Amino acid sequence: MVNLRVRCIVLAGALFAVAGAAHADDWTLDGVERVVAVSDIHGAHQELVATLQTAGVVDAAQRWSAAGTHLVIVGDIVDRGDDSRASMDLLMRLEPEAAAAGGKVHVVLGNHDVMNIVGDLRYTTKGEYAAFAAEESPAVREAAFQRHLSGRASDTTAVEDVRREFDHAYPPGFFAHRAAFAAGATYGKWLLGKPLLLQIILAGQPGLLTTLG
């Protein structure tokens, strides 16, 4: 298991490196007038919305209202809290809205975002899985259970007890969540296109704002 995790992390690192070489110019910004930075959302979606509204980044309808402002999300959208999907959906919607107004949304990857991509789910909550439950096929879930059950052929545990263990280990929505974070799927593809480093040169300022997720 440890070796598998190491291989996954190395693979993810290689993917990020390739993406970085292709889009490095997008991650170095010069002459930015205003930056709003938010870090460690961790599924606290309502708090994110309240913060953005207080900063004038979005209006009461959660639409971009900050003109040429650059919003920087400093890593860790996911894990620990239940509403990370709502936060990702909001940020994905705000990206084109900000661009149309002359601003920009930047998402810098944090370790928890990378962990979800590579399948390290130690801090993922049942609520985060539940957000994907409506998209989880009963057939996919049952097939996964049958594979789990076949691996315990010599076990004398009753099937209903094994199913309870299975449901605890793989809560409703687990398999749809994993599918959505695959490299070619909605959230996996979106996150894989994000940098690990963002450098902003503020207008009229001699220094740099350098952000690591």
Identify the role of each PLM range.
Residues A22-G213:
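Feature recognizes metal-dependent phosphohydrolase scaffolds
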Residues C8-V18:
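Bacterial N-terminal signal peptides
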